[in-house]
Structures are given as structure tokens and as C-alpha cells.
Amino acid sequence: MGRSFEVRKASMAKTAGAKIKVYSKYGKEIYVLAKNGSSDPDMNLPLKHLIAKAKKDQVPAHVIDKAIDKANGGGGEDFQPARYEGFGPGGTSVIVDCLTDNGNRTFQDVRQCFVKTGAKIGVEGTVSHMFAHQAVFQFAGEDDEIILETLMMEDVDVTDVELEDGVITVFAPTTEFFKTKTALNAAFPDLTLDVEEITFVPQTTTPIAEEDSEKFQKFLDMLDDCDDVQQVYHNAEL
């Protein structure tokens, strides 16, 4: 895994249209976390982390504030998480996470992305067992041993710490996300976390043949165009 884990999500072009989609995805997720918990980030750690992540991705403050205000207002949409799994073009393994207020619509939208690219949507558990659901932190560094020792001293249940090409990657159970982040920030105040998220890390990767690469990119683009799709994880070697 290490640096090559790349949190295999669909990349988004830096166009105005793509930015609007990013803002919409963050706005929806912030709204859900604020509505289902406290709208005060200091009282809701997942919300606090998501807001920090949104700011890092240059989501405007008014988008964040609007989502929180909407949650405080009560009513509104009732979004539920939905996850779909299957095999993408080239035999790749794919997990699609959504937030939806209409499960039937979302399923049909996601299914069409699979069907129109010759992919095959499966049932729950079809490919998720091929991924590790983990907290991942990545930052520049050269001494992975001191990182491991520090986290162990703080009683963090670390899964693995890897060093590759001057980049350190820390893997931990999802339940240890905030404990790991707090320990890293406390021990290394000047540390810049380039990646800090809970994600699906593929246990193995699948090379994409040249004849499948265009179809696979079309598949990702179609999923990106689905309003309800929040994240796409895959094991393709692009």
C-alpha cells in the first residue's frame, strides 16, 4: 500500500462545473452530519473534521455555513447513506458511496453507469471484502520508526506505518481516527497532514489494459455526474 494506496477515488477536473459538484457533495455531507448530531463543530468531531477537509479543498465558507444553517432549521431532506459494489471495466473492483433521499432513483442512476460501460453491479459484499476500511494519514517524513513509537506510546492501535520515497503513511482502524490525529498533532505540532481520512484501501490492485482505460475513465466520469454519489473507491492501476 504505502504511497501507492492513492485513496482510489474518482479525480475531478478543476473546472467551474466540477467545483460546483464538489461544493454540492460537501454541502450535503455537512448538512447530514450537522442534522444527525450537533451543528457545533466543537461538539461534533466528525463534522469538525469534515469542515476542515472542505476548507482544504477550497470550499467557500458560505457553502459550509448554508449547510449548517439548513440543518439548524429543521425539516429539509432526509438523506440516507447507500453503498453499491461491483466490477468496473477491466475487471476492477469498485465501491460507490452515496447519500440519497430516493434510494430507487440513486440505484438506477448508479446501475446505468455500470451497464453503459460494460461493468457489472453486484450485491452487498461483492467486492468490499477486497478492501480494508481504514483511517489513513499521509505526510512527508523520513523516520517511520519514530512515528510508530510515538503512536504506540499514546496507546494508538496502529495497523501499519510505511515509508516510501520520503512519504510516511499511517494506517489505523477507523475507530482510531481522531485518537491517531490528536497524537500526531500533539507530538509533531508542525506536521502537515497531506491525507487524513477514512477510506477503503484495496488489498490488491488490478492493472488496466490500454483498451479498457478509456472505458474506465468514462465509468468514473459518469459516476461523478451522479448527484447522489459522494465517493468512489476502486483498485485500478491507472
Swiss-Prot record:
GO MF annotation: an example: DNA binding
Primary location recorded for the protein, binned into one broad class: cytoplasm
InterPro entries found in the cross-reference section: Integrase-like_N, TACO1_YebC-like_2nd/3rd_dom, TACO1_YebC_N, Transcrip_reg_TACO1-like, Transcrip_reg_TACO1-like_dom3, YebC-like
Top-level taxon in the UniProt lineage: Bacteria
One Gene Ontology term from the biological process aspect of the record: regulation of DNA-templated transcription
Keyword list, A-Z: Cytoplasm, DNA-binding, Transcription, Transcription regulation
One Gene Ontology cellular component annotation held by this UniProt entry: cytosol
Pfam family of the protein (one): TACO1_YebC_N
Subcellular location(s) per record: Cytoplasm
Entry's family note: Belongs to the TACO1 family.
Record-linked NCBIfam families: PRK12378.1
Protein name: Probable transcriptional regulatory protein VS_II1504
Species name: Vibrio atlanticus (strain LGP32)
